[in-house]
Amino acid sequence: MSKNYLFTSESVSEGHPDKLADQISDAILDEILKQDKNARVACETLVKTGMALVAGEITTSAWIDIEELVRKVIVETGYDNANKGIDGRTCSVINAIGKQSSDIAQGVDRGSLEDLGAGDQGLMFGFATNETPTLMPSAIYYSHLLMRKQAEHRKSGKLGWLRPDAKAQVTLAYENDKPKFIDTIVLSTQHNESISQKDLHDAVIEEIVKEVIPAELITKDTKYHINPTGVFLIGGPQGDCGLTGRKIIVDTYGGAAHHGGGAFSGKDPSKVDRSGAYMGRYIAKNVVAAGLADKCEVQVAYAIGVAKPVSLMVNTFGTGKISDSKIEKLVSETFDLRVGKIIENLDLLRPIYRKTSNYGHFGRELPEFTWEKIDKADNLKSAAKI
């Protein structure tokens, strides 16, 4: 790749139909974990006009009122009137949950957490870069900020004409592999009938874009596409069917890193799609925070029923202060990559997952997000002798 280029990432709001589905799946997981930390949960959700379908495999001693919980999440997300796309108070809720296969359980459940086998085969990636304060790629970082500000102004009533469904996209111009300025911002937001397109355009730029995008990244040539198709009244599940796990690039690094293909929401941490990806981020972030590289990508892979990974790979894209093979060795010595130890060390059996389902699983330094800690950075730096 040339050192001078444009790079684009997108984010979506919590009211986007796919994100509504993710929230429902993770809310169900959280409620189960409150009662049963040993539960096995794989919960998928589909939302469409007037209905929500919950399906998957759950094995647990917990009891939760799934219908009530689904309705609660839909209303809390802002869908409390059918003219917004769905009304959580009146929509149909269909429950098609079954139990986890006993064939899978016999390979995964081994008694002690330390011996826990991976819930499936798969490959996961973690990534970090020193482009932003949270060590996330710039385009996804700013896309998430735009969507969080849209939600903030909608909920506070500051921009009372906003509705829940929205998307943002940011294109960064890179020079010598470093982000220099924003070339293009795209933001589409659902709204009610009371706002004109001109007033909406001006308000989005003044009250959303300028509140979160640093002025030094905006130039006279920065292009804005605000609701570029015009009116956006029909949104949410009425406009598009929503499905769990369909925004995996929004959930991770905005396309700036590889993705193993597995979604996160609705899965308990015995599923390495989730826990392995969280561990990958934890490793990559600590490597960059330690100053061992400007950019780091980690791949781990697992076999179903096997506790240890079948492979580990570290790539610093030529930015490493020591060789990638040396960093890989330090990672192996510093981090325990057995599935059960990942769950234990990152404390993943807590009901924290609905918070992850919006605005990215990575790059938000919340107390619950243990994979965002940089508590291993000093150890890595000391061991690397740099």
Swiss-Prot record:
Keywords: ATP-binding, Cytoplasm, Magnesium, Metal-binding, Nucleotide-binding, One-carbon metabolism, Potassium, Transferase. GO terms for molecular function: ATP binding; magnesium ion binding; methionine adenosyltransferase activity. Mg(2+) binds at residue 18. Residues 100-110 are annotated as: Flexible loop. Its main location: cytoplasm. One of its GO terms (biological process) is S-adenosylmethionine biosynthetic process. Binds 2 divalent ions per subunit. Pathway: Amino-acid biosynthesis; S-adenosyl-L-methionine biosynthesis; S-adenosyl-L-methionine from L-methionine: step 1/1. K(+) binds at residue 44. ATP binds at residues 16, 165-167, 240, 246-247, 263, 267. It catalyses: L-methionine + ATP + H2O = S-adenosyl-L-methionine + phosphate + diphosphate. The keyword Plastid does not apply. GO terms for cellular component: cytoplasm. Its EC number is 2.5.1.6. Its cofactor is Mg(2+); K(+). PANTHER family: S-ADENOSYLMETHIONINE SYNTHETASE (PTHR11964). HAMAP family: S_AdoMet_synth1. Belongs to the AdoMet synthase family. NCBIfam families: metK. This is S-adenosylmethionine synthase. It comes from Francisella philomiragia subsp. philomiragia (strain ATCC 25017 / CCUG 19701 / FSC 153 / O#319-036).
